[in-house]
A protein has these predicted regions:
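Conserved lysine of the Walker
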Residues: 36
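Conserved NTPase motor "head" modules and their coupling/switch loops across ABC/AAA+ ATPases, GTPases
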Residues: 1-31, 172-187, 191-308, 317-321, ...
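Walker B catalytic acidic pair
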Residues: 312-314
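Helix-to-loop junction immediately C-terminal to a conserved catalytic motif
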Residues: 44
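Structural recognition of the conserved hydrophobic beta-strand(s) that form the central parallel beta-sheet
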Residues: 72, 335-342
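A conserved P-loop NTPase coupling/switch region
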Residues: 106-113, 117-183, 187, 366
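Nucleotide-state sensing region of NTPase/ATPase domains
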Residues: 48-124, 128-130, 139-142, 146, ...
């Protein structure tokens, strides 16, 4: 799979911009704050409908404009599709081959993307919500049903929290309604847990070896953390129902649901030590890079497609050996789009085989193709 071209209108610092890419290596270079990261973000938003950098869609729209528009051609298995995304301050318009798509889950996964950017260090250093968001985004691409299940779960979670808030306000709550709600809630919770656990278990087959190849360190591991006893013979749903009963009085007092996948986490360890607490920044960066590169294998295993790899300023913090070790895991079948401020950081052979795209102030200055 590769992105053949993209058109960007009124997005961040891009007014009216279009560019084509080659199926293998593409390098976007230029000084800081010229739009390199914004272009990668535009590609990501076109595929995922949301930004990896911002939770607020309005920030994507160029100042003094009411809408942003993205359009790109994706090529896969000798076929092609045209994706379109319009972003206004109140809604999004999605199209595939000029046909409007109503459900986001029917749109996402038509362009499979893996992105690394400097702030990804927060995947290790930050709070659990960032890691849950990462899993949700990746699983939405891998499994067609995941986003629908997640949306159902979030609706049920909101309904349940609304009931619990009634206790806080001293209002009447129908306990039988809450009991029925709990059955639906725990059913969706188990589906989410199973897909997340399968995702993490599959990553574990690849990440430790990639981490060792890049960093030279052994002993890396991942763990999906949940409050459910995974060794128990009792089903996940039954255990979760029991925990909801156990925490019922506390939840009534606080007005929020205290257990479920919305509280789970993804943990990173090196030789048994929690990387968030004891890892160096370099080790944390290697962990995230290994995680992202392992995802390539998951897409190939599950979807029989190689995803598009977006690497934002990944080389500036790596020494020569680590840069070369990283590049060994990117083969010519993977379309890779890299941003850098310094071409000299890149291997000469890499540059020779790449399309070089020079960006300045949201405009194309030059483009040299192989």
């Amino acid at each position: 799979m590769y992105l053949k071209n993209i058109y960007v209108s009124h997005f961040r610092n891009y007014d009216d911009f279009q560019i084509s890419f080659q199926p293998s290596m593409n390098i976007i270079y230029g000084n800081n704050a010229q739009g390199k990261t914004n272009l990668l973000e535009a590609i990501y938003v076109l595929g995922m409908t949301k930004s990896h950098r911002s939770f607020i869609d309005n920030t994507l729209i160029q100042k003094n404009e009411s809408t942003a528009y993205l359009k790109g051609t994706v090529v896969f298995q000798e076929q092609s599709e045209t994706l379109e995304l319009g972003i206004s301050k109140t809604k999004k318009l999605l199209k595939i081959d000029h046909n409007e798509i109503k459900k986001m889950s029917d749109y996402i996964s038509h362009m499979n993307l893996i992105i690394f950017y400097p702030e990804d260090l927060d995947l290790v250093k930050g709070g659990p919500s960032l890691r849950r968001r990462f899993m949700n985004l990746e699983l939405s691409q891998l499994y067609a049903t995941y986003l629908d299940v997640l949306n159902d779960y979030n609706k049920l979670l909101k309904m349940r929290n609304d009931c619990l808030k009634q206790y806080v306000k001293g209002e009447y709550v129908d306990e039988s309604y809450l009991s029925i709600l709990d059955q639906y809630f725990t059913n969706k919770a188990e589906l989410i847990y199973r897909m997340r656990k399968k995702f993490v278990d599959k990553l574990t087959q690849y990440v430790p070896e990639i981490f060792e190849d890049i960093s030279g360190l052994t002993g890396f591991s991942l763990n999906y953390h949940t409050n459910i006893d995974l060794s128990s013979q009792v089903s996940y749903q039954e255990q979760l129902l029991e925990k909801l009963k156990k925490h019922h009085e506390t939840e009534k007092r606080l007005g929020v649901t205290l257990v479920g996948p919305h509280k789970d986490d993804l943990e990173f360890f090196l030789n048994g030590n929690h990387l968030k607490l004891y890892g160096s920044q370099g080790q944390q960066r290697m962990a995230v890079l290994a995680l992202k590169l392992a995802e390539i294998h998951l897409f190939q295993d599950y979807k029989k497609e190689t995803p598009i790899l977006l690497l934002d300023d990944v080389f500036s913090e790596l020494d020569f050996n680590k840069r070369n070790n990283l590049l060994k895991h990117i083969n010519h079948n993977t379309q890779t789009i890299i941003t850098t401020t310094e071409l000299e950081l890149l291997d000469t052979k890499l540059i020779e085989n790449a399309s070089l795209i020079h960006i300045h102030d949201g405009k194309l200055i030059s483009k040299d193709e192989v």
